[in-house]
Amino acid sequence: MKNLDRLFVLTGLVFLLIGMALGLKMSATMDFTLHGLHAHLNLLGFVLMTLFGLCYRAWPKMVESKLATVHYFLHTVCVAVALFLLYFLLSNPELGPKIGPVMDGFLGGAYLGILIFAYLVLTRAKE
């Protein structure tokens, strides 16, 4: 996919804007119930997406694989859905038994995306 590195960084910025807005809301209301969501939006969303984008820029051979595009969509969709579910879980802990297993499935998908990224780094980031 063309400009995949830029797409990772731009998507990371979206996660950052949402995460920081949530942080500002928590600070303004002094209600830190969603602090775990705030942290994961910034780490899984912004930090990892930006790191992925910079790596794809540094090693363009990684982008030549169709797995790079799979990695982007897998990570983006799975993290977004998992964090959406985390919002409901933190807001309504009694939903844990119903939401938890579904969220775990999406986190497993995000982990699969990270495994794809690791494979691409190990096999294509040689120069």
PLM features: what roles do these ranges have?
Residues 1-127:
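Hydrophobic alpha-helical transmembrane segments of multi-pass integral membrane proteins
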